[in-house]
């Protein structure tokens, strides 16, 4: 770390017990003491990294004199202490770093310079798919299949962990990156050779903000920005507005942390917090357990903020002690936070914020969210009514007026034989479910009942609204003992009364760390969960990222043949269309406790207040209230089952891995030996033909529209992580390279191969490209007579051969969701030069610039609809060449010429927001910029 210029004489000494530390005291700079907590962390960062060039005295004073009411305008350079990765985004990062080593050498530089300068840590959590479920060996089977599919990727990552310094990998089967981060990796305060400073961390996953609950400033970035940060490049940003979110009151009985976070998500998304920090304050904060704070922080991308910060206090210290952090580290965290004014003191003067919101926690009520956005909160008491209303958008089937619709039969179709078993023999709780029906009480809603014969020979009926997947999944909730213990206890009470999950429900339990398995064992809750089909399925992201695995064949066939609007209920953070399963249309976020309840109900068309879940052994109706665990029961179980020793044991050898990981055959050497036949790992093309000096920026001429899209297009829509559909360009590529269909794996797992990923860009099965009348990865190919429909990738190949650049048109909130750098990489490799939208989500806008694609916005109040653009026009964009002169134009002129010669002209806003971003764009991307700097030095 370069020594700070220390213009304010801020370097001081902190004595903690018998050990002393150097630190940069905020008290040396007048004004710092009044700042919100999150800006104090930024202020310290600038004090410590002041170099007189990129970070100057003026930048530090700008933070200290922050005007809460002003719009962001002052650029600063933020240097995170570490970088966090998961394997889907991490594999392409390591591919890029390996490629950069060769490129630096080609440009005359030293390849050994390509090493992380600050700690970079990866947790492999995105690759496990729930193939096996509802059986005792589900975990073993899923891990076995995971290694078979991903051996090549895992060999590459193990090579990277040895070839690069300052880079560590947590092996598969350990947990989810964000849960492992808060339970083990997070430092809260760093001790770097006796220099103490706040732990700050950016990650290649948008839910990196989970660490905000621990008082750690950080957020998700694209993989390309993370790579630059690893190599010493600071994160360019504007000093943000900070939204103060005041918490008062206490959470009432019967309300979960999930209910609180869904309420906060709805409030903040409605308020508008994109590009802003959110900070929680008020006396209610002290009543929010650390696990709940982490859950709230985790959902920051869903409400759109850069981060969602909680300050450090006694609750933080209690959590660090519980999770097994060394006492010396805990003492440093407390002493440092108090010395820097970063400790939450009750009744201390409130900081000034840019905007204010307030929530009385006592007013929160049980909720779920869906069917396609996390911010679409539904009161549990109104869930049935809202489902019936939303269902109309997913089916044209008529509303049922009575119970007279006969169920269609699916027996013996598609080669399925009653009594036979699949290779994995997946049957929910091993019972046939004779006579069960998801079409019961269907009067008043669309209904299309289908009778399915189970493998055991029993019959049951499915219908619109059937819960096809009930999944306890995701770090968002599995990191929270109160809701996880609650799920186990409701399962216990349900099992005691003879209730079961419905036979058509795929039941999944995939916690975010092995600690959950430990306390479930201690509390003897596994037998109760297993009685309802919730066997341990894996330690990883699973359902939350679409790794739900296939539904049983007979159920999948029935859903697809009869176009049923099946649903999934998950304890995750995202429920975008097409994300959870290709067989499921409607997705709902809920607490783990409600996941159990919906598995028993078997349908979203259910009123938990007034409808019985079933009958007990004596024939008495059993309602949700009869099996809901009390707060006292949950707390008593937590106290008995969870201890510091549990965390210490599970994290003692966290980097060691299982036998399969240890026995992987890995290559040696500092540069990677690329295999041209590999379908997983290919040398990245971004530096091919790169010169020592950047080429001039050019205007865009005669561009065609690749896609015309609506609002809330997610990075899932742009670059799905889901399974690869046979017959698509990605599948055709794998077929041509001898990959069997069952070995396609997911697009997310193949992010180390740009050939697959290019073909998978804009290939989401739910993408609605308004140029065509079909959902999926299609467009019109205007290089052909009449502009016929074609796969997007195939059209792009033709456009490239014809030398025609491309643009994308879209509506509001373009690029929402995951911090998926491949959504920008794929866009670039397909030949897209500009994306024109009404608004962008933060991370994707930054990623586009990082890949040399210019983000543009329609004039305020305008859209492609209001301007009458139908996507058949040719586009000219002029004014970009001003970037060659060192200035960033505020707007550029866009001329869209229709087929009849009519022109539509408008001034698009250039969303290159900082001088640093302009530098990246001039160089063709952030990695090219960093590479040229390395080669030059």
UniProtKB/Swiss-Prot annotation:
GO terms for MF: 2-methylisocitrate dehydratase activity; 4 iron, 4 sulfur cluster binding; aconitate hydratase activity; metal ion binding; mRNA 3'-UTR binding; mRNA binding
Organism placement in taxonomy: Bacteria, Bacillati, Actinomycetota, Actinomycetes, Mycobacteriales
Family (UniProt): Belongs to the aconitase/IPM isomerase family.
Name this protein carries in UniProt: Aconitate hydratase A
EC number: 4.2.1.3, 4.2.1.99
Gene source species: Corynebacterium efficiens (strain DSM 44549 / YS-314 / AJ 12310 / JCM 11189 / NBRC 100395)
Positions with a binding annotation for [4Fe-4S] cluster: 475, 541, 544
Bias (Low complexity): 433-444
Pfam short name (any one): Aconitase_C
Superkingdom of origin: Bacteria
């Amino acid at each position: 770390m370069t020594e700070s210029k220390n213009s304010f004489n801020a370097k001081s000494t902190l004595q903690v017990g018998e050990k002393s530390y150097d630190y940069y005291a905020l008290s040396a700079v007048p004004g710092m003491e009044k700042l919100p907590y999150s800006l104090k962390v930024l202020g310290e960062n600038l004090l410590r990294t002041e170099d007189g060039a990129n970070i100057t005295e003026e930048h530090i004073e700008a933070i200290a004199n922050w005007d809460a009411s002003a719009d962001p305008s002052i650029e600063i350079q933020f240097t995170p202490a570490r970088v966090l990765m998961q394997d889907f985004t991490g594999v392409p990062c390591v591919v890029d770093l390996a490629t950069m080593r060769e490129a630096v050498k080609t440009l005359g530089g030293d390849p050994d310079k390509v090493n992380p300068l600050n700690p970079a840590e990866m947790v492999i959590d995105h690759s496990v798919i729930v193939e096996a479920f509802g059986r005792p060996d589900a975990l073993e089977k899923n891990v076995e299949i995971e290694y078979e599919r991903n051996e090549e990727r895992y060999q590459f990552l193990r090579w990277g962990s040895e070839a690069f310094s300052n880079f560590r990998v947590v092996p598969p089967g350990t947990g989810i990156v964000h849960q492992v981060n808060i339970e083990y990796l997070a430092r809260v305060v760093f001790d770097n050779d006796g220099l103490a400073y706040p732990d700050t961390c950016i990650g290649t996953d948008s839910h990196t903000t989970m660490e905000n609950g621990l008082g750690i400033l950080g957020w998700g970035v694209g993989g390309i920005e993370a790579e630059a940060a690893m190599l010493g490049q600071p994160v360019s940003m504007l000093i943000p507005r900070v939204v103060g979110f005041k918490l008062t009151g206490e959470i009432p009985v019967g309300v979960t942390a999930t209910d609180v976070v869904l309420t906060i998500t709805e409030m903040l998304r409605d308020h508008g917090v994109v590009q802003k920090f959110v900070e929680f304050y008020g006396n209610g904060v002290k009543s929010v357990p650390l696990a709940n704070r982490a859950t709230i922080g985790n959902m920051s991308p869903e409400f759109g903020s850069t981060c969602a910060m909680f300050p450090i206090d006694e609750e933080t210290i209690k959590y660090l002690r519980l999770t097994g952090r060394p006492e010396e580290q805990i003492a440093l965290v407390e002493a440092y936070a108090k010395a820097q004014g970063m400790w939450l003191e009750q009744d201390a003067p409130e900081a000034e914020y840019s905007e204010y919101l307030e929530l009385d926690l006592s007013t929160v009520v049980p909720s779920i969210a869906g069917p396609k956005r996390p911010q679409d909160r539904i009161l549990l008491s109104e869930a049935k009514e809202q489902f019936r209303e939303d269902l109309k958008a997913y089916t044209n089937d008529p509303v049922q007026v009575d119970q007279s619709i006969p169920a269609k039969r699916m027996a013996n179709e598609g080669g399925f034989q009653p009594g036979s078993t699949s290779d994995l023999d997946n049957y929910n709780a091993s019972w046939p479910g004779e006579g069960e029906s998801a079409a019961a009480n269907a009067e008043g809603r669309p209904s299309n009942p289908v009778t399915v014969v189970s493998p055991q020979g029993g019959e049951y009926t499915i219908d619109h609204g059937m819960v096809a997947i009930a999944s306890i999944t995701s770090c968002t909730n599995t990191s929270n003992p109160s809701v996880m213990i609650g799920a186990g206890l409701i399962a216990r009470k349900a099992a005691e009364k003879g209730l079961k999950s419905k036979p058509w429900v795929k039941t999944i339990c995939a916690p975010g760390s092995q600690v959950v398995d430990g306390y479930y064992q201690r509390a003897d809750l596994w037998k109760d969960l297993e009685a309802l089909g919730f066997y341990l399925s894996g330690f990883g992201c699973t359902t939350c990222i679409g790794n739900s695995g296939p539904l049983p064949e007979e159920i999948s066939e029935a859903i697809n043949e009869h176009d049923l609007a099946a649903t999934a209920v998950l304890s995750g953070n995202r429920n975008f269309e097409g994300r959870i399963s290709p067989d499921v249309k409607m997705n709902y976020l809920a607490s783990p406790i409600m996941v159990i309840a919906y598995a028993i109900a078997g349908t979203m068309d259910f009123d938990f207040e007034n409808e019985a879940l079933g009958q007990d052994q004596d024939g008495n109706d059993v309602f949700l209230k009869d099996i809901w665990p009390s707060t006292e029961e949950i707390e008593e179980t937590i106290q008995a089952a969870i201890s510091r020793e549990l965390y210490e044991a599970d994290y003692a050898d966290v980097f060691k891995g299982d036998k399969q990981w240890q026995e992987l055959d890995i290559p040696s050497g500092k540069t990677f030996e690329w295999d041209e036949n590999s379908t997983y790992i290919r040398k990245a093309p971004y530096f091919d033909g790169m010169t020592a000096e950047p080429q001039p920026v050019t205007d865009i001429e005669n561009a065609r529209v690749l896609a015309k899209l609506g609002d809330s297009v997610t990075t899932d829509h742009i670059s799905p992580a889901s399974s690869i559909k046979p017959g698509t360009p990605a599948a055709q590529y794998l077929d041509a390279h001898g990959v069997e269909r069952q070995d396609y794996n997911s697009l997310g797992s193949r992010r180390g191969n740009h050939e697959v990923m290019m073909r998978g860009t804009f290939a989401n099965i739910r993408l609605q490209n308004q140029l065509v009348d079909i959902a999926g990865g299609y467009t019109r190919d205007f290089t052909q007579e009449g502009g016929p429909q074609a796969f997007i990738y195939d059209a792009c190949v033709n456009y490239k051969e014809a030398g025609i650049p491309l643009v994308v048109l879209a509506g509001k909130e373009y690029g929402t969701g995951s911090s998926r750098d491949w959504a920008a990489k794929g866009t670039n490799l397909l030949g897209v030069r500009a994306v024109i939208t009404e608004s962008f989500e933060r991370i994707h806008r930054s990623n586009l610039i990082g890949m040399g694609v210019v983000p543009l916005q329609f004039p305020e109040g305008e859209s492609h609809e209001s301007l009458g653009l139908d996507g058949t026009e040719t586009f000219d964009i002029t004014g970009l060449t001003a970037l060659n002169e060192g200035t960033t134009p505020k707007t550029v002129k866009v001329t869209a010429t229709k087929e009849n010669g009519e022109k539509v002209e408008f001034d698009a806003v250039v969303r290159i927001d900082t001088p640093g971003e302009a530098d990246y764009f001039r160089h063709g991307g952030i990695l090219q910029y960093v590479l040229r700097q390395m080669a030059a030095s």
